[in-house]
Design a protein with these regions (language model features):
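Signature of N-terminal electron-transfer/Fe-S-associated modules in redox systems
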Residues: 1-194
Length: 194
C-alpha cells in the first residue's frame, strides 16, 4: 500500500505493508533509529514520537494511519547540530544514562510542554507515567523537564552540541550525552526481543 506522510519535515512516499507499525516504518524504511522498540505493547514509551505535534507511542500506530500527517522523531528536533531546549535540558540535568529510553522521554516531554508549558513536578511525573526508565530513578528526568520549561518560558534558544571540556567532562562524554538525547548515539543498543 502506498503511504505519503511528512517525517521530520521531509515529504515521503513509500510502499508499506498495511500492518506495518509506525515505529518499524521509522526504523526500517526511514532509517531513523531514535524511536526504540522496547516492548511492542505500549508499556514503555521508548518509541514515543510526535504525530501532528501530539506525543504518541509509535508501536500503537499503523503507518497507514499516519498517512497525510506529520511525524517528528528525536532526530527531527535537532537539525544542524543544535539541540532542542528539551534535549539540552536532559543533557544538562543528567536526565539520561544508557540512553535507550531517552529519545522517547524527550518526545513525551516536548508533547507535555506543548500542552502544559508550566507544569508542576507532580504534573511532570503524571505526564511521563507512560515512559519507563530502568536507570535513572526519574529524579533527574523530572529536573530536566522543569529546566526545559523554565528555558522555554525565558525564551532561550536551543544550544549547540557540546564542546570538549567546558564543564570538566571529556568531549566524548558530552557528545555521547547529546547523541543520546537525539537518538543518534554511536553504540546503539540491541532491541528487546530482537
Amino acid at each position: 500500500m502506498q503511504v505519503e506522510l511528512t517525517v521530520n519535515g521531509q515529504q515521503r512516499s513509500d510502499e508499506v505493508e498495511p500492518r506495518l507499525l509506525l515505529v518499524h516504518y521509522l526504523r526500517e524504511v526511514c532509517g531513523l533509529r531514535a524511536a526504540n522498540v522496547g516492548c511492542d505493547t505500549t508499556s514503555c514509551g521508548a518509541c514515543t514520537v510526535l504525530l501532528n505535534g501530539t506525543s504518541v507511542k509509535s508501536c500503537t500506530v499503523l503507518t497507514v494511519q499516519a498517512a497525510g500527517q506529520q511525524v517528528t522523531t528525536a532526530e527531527g528536533l535537532a537539525p544542524d547540530g543544535e539541540l532542542h531546549p528539551v534535549q539540552a535540558a536532559f543533557r544538562q540535568e543528567h536526565g539520561l544514562q544508557c540512553g535507550f529510553c531517552t529519545p522517547g522521554m524527550v518526545m513525551a516531554t516536548v508533547g507535555l510542554l506543548s500542552e502544559n508549558p508550566h507544569p508542576t513536578e507532580a504534573e511532570v511525573r503524571e505526564g511521563l507515567e507512560g515512559n519507563f526508565c530502568r536507570c535513572t530513578g526519574y529524579h533527574n528526568i523530572v529536573r530536566a523537564v522543569l529546566a526545559a520549561a523554565a528555558t522555554a518560558a525565558a525564551g532561550a534558544p536551543a544550544t549547540e552540541a557540546p564542546a570538549a571540556g567546558a564543564d570538566g567532562t571529556s568531549g566524548a562524554d558530552r557528545t555521547a550525552g547529546a547523541d543520546r538525547t537525539t537518538g543518534t548515539a554511536a553504540g546503539e543498543r540491541a532491541e528487546v526481543g530482537a
